Amino acid sequence: VQMPEESAIRLLKDRYGMTGALKRFDTEKDDTFRVTTEDGRRFILKVANPDEPFTEIDFQNSLLRYVETRDPTLPVPRINDTEDGVDIFQIKDVDGSQRCVRLLTFLEGTPLDETQSDKTGRVQIGKMLARLRYATEGFTHEAEDRYYGWDVQHLLTLEHLLDEVDDYTQRQALSQGLERFRHIEVKLRQCRKHVLHND
């Protein structure tokens, strides 16, 4: 059940003591709103899907806090606690489902899919990913072994979705990529790993 905007506004006021204009983002499964306060500050209010366990949300918050201590200048969202000092709280939705709620800072910028890819941009992305990799080194959490289809180590589990790609050229390119991956998968399993979201 999609959370009504009025409910999100009430959560902001009751738990964070703030008011502002909301813009809903289209997401895969959560209710996500950009909040713009009267003084121009921006935040992201995330209301997790009822199927998302608390441990997963805690994993994400713990990782963000860990990164902040390892590389404070790395541009990742910062967590905002409620007025009573809680970083995640649960609500009961209109259908009785439990949902986790949290407030993060909003990162200004242009989404990658709206930019032109050039060598300079790719180098900058590579540098940022390297910083993120080092900032996450050593992080552990009880939920770190969760399964995500887009995690590279599970790439072949998506092979059955190739038939869903209508464009023949794109489907062939994806198929060839999966075939190349099949040959390196064994070597990949032998590599050292640490927590990485891959999103």
Go through each PLM region and give its residues.
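Active-site acidic catalytic loop and adjacent metal/ATP-binding pocket
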Residues: 28-40, 44-45, 79, 182-199
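Accessory alpha/beta interaction modules
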Residues: 1-14, 34-35, 41
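Short secondary-structure junctions
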Residues: 12-19, 71-75, 188
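A cross-family kinase active-site recognition segment
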Residues: 83, 114-172, 192-193
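Generic alpha-helical secondary structure signal
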Residues: 99-102, 153, 176
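ATP-binding pocket architecture of kinase catalytic cores
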Residues: 38-140
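Protein kinase glycine-rich loop
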Residues: 23-26
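An alpha-helical support segment within catalytic cores of ATP-dependent transferases
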Residues: 4-12, 141, 156-198
